[in-house]
Amino acid sequence: NQSALNDLMSLERVEVIKGPQSTLFGKNSSAGVISITTKLPENEFGGKIQITGGDYGLQKIGGTVTGPISENTSFRITASTHERDGYTKNLNTGNEINDRDRYSVRAQLLSEVSDRLTLRLIVDSDSADENCCTTSALTNGAATLGFASVIGPMLGKPVIKNPVDPFGYETYLDKEPRTKIDTSGISFHVDYEMENVKFKSITAYRESEQEVFDGDVD
C-alpha cells in the first residue's frame, strides 16, 4: 500500500525472502517477499526526530515517541511529512511537476496481559497528493523529431530541444501525471502461547481511495 512509499521512522528490521512464500505470506507472494517489521512500543520513554532539507524546497520531518501508559501497557506514535517543489518543467503548460507532498501517521498500543497473552492495536493513515511522475528524454528519436516538426509550427513554439540536454529536466505533456492516494487501516493482534502451541490472530480492515492519472505526450 501507500505505506511503502513513505518514510518509515521506527524500523526494527527488513527481510528479503526469495522464492515462493505463499504458505507464510499468502497467494500474492509467489516471487518472494520484502518483509518490513516496525518497532514495538516500549516500557521506557524514548523517541527520535529527523529533519532533512535540500534543493527544490525539500523538507522532510519525521519522528517517533514511545513510552508506558500503565504497568503492562505501552504506546508508540510515529509520523512523517515529505514535501518538495517540482523540478521538471512541462514546456506545454509551464508548470513544474515531479513534486512531493506526502504525510503519514501510525499509532500502536501494546498490552502484555500475562506471560502468555499479548494484545496489540495498530492504527495508521497515509496520504499523497502530487503532480508526479515523469521523466526526461536522453535523446530525440525519429518519431519525436517528426512529431515536433509538425506540432511545433502549429503551436507557434518549439516543443522539444534538439539536441536534448540530459540534465535539463524538461518534458512536453498535454495531460500532466497526478497521484492522489489516501489510505487508512486498523488491525488487532492477539498472541497466546500454550505449552506446545502458539496461537496468533490478526483482525484487520484497510480502506484506500486513489486518483491516478498518467501523463500524455500527444
Feature-to-residue mapping (PLM):
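A generic secondary-structure micro-motif detector
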Residues: N1, T52, E96, E176-P177
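Short acidic/polar hinge/loop motifs at secondary-structure boundaries
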Residues: N1-K18
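Outer-membrane beta-barrel translocator/receptor signature
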Residues: L8-E12, T23-N90, N95-V105, R116-L117, ...
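Flexible loop residues that form catalytic
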Residues: G19, T78, H82, E112, ...
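Short, glycine/serine-rich, charged loops/turns that create anion-binding
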Residues: Q21, P41, R206-E209
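Outer-membrane beta-barrel domain signature, strongest for Gram-negative TonB-dependent receptors
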Residues: G94, R100-D218
